[in-house]
């Protein structure tokens, strides 16, 4: 329990846990802190599932406020990804993930629906009041409450994996963890950052300081995929320069001009 491994997805956390169990002859109980950041917050804050905003709550809030609050349940990976067709919900959640006000998020003009700033302010008030009335929190609130609570365990070593996919609020939580830790290892690849649409802040990963260790040999990517991927990714200006080798197989690259093929 002196080792913490926290990843963006539950799959990565469980894979790392299973490998550690096999290599060091440990049991699952020996590695209680191999989990996602949201899972850690959920556990340490003593939250129950019924304390968390669910689809039915958003539907109820929508019925009471007159807004169509379409909302998909959080995925089983416990990433905290919030998917909705409602720009009102999206603006509020993106603002919290980015540590900015809803008004500032609104002014970024990333939404597509016809929403006034007055409607947004009223919705924020209604949402906060609803959560207060029913003693509920959402997944992003968990991160904020964890940081405020100062309930992070003290570790000898912490691993933060898939770091390129963390939001600013998750980076704040990660810092609150490694501030109590002797050694911290941050793993990720900015070239694999695909969740900016969901609030991921790859710039926080790129600007991290410390000793850098590059893994230069891929055991999954064949040569032809490496070649075309390198041509595409090198067009991105804000990225960490890196050199890596593909596996020895040549591989096969197919082109399609019709999505039905």
Regions from the language model: what does each represent?
Residues 39-42, 144, 227-230:
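Generic alpha-helical structural context detector
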Residues 23, 40, 47, 95-98, ...:
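Phosphate/oxyanion-binding loops and surfaces in catalytic or ligand/nucleic-acid-binding neighborhoods
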Residues 1-50:
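P-loop NTPase Walker
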Residues 30-31, 36, 55-64, 114-128, ...:
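SF2 helicase/translocase NTPase motor core
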Residues 1, 20, 61-65, 142, ...:
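Alpha-helix C-terminal capping segments
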Residues 40-88, 92:
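A basic- and aromatic-enriched beta-loop-alpha substructure that forms the phosphate/nucleotide-
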Residues 8-11, 35, 157, 164-251, ...:
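Conserved helicase motor core of SF1/SF2 NTP-dependent helicases
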Residues 2, 71-159, 168-173, 186, ...:
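Accessory N-terminal region flanking or inserted into the helicase ATPase core
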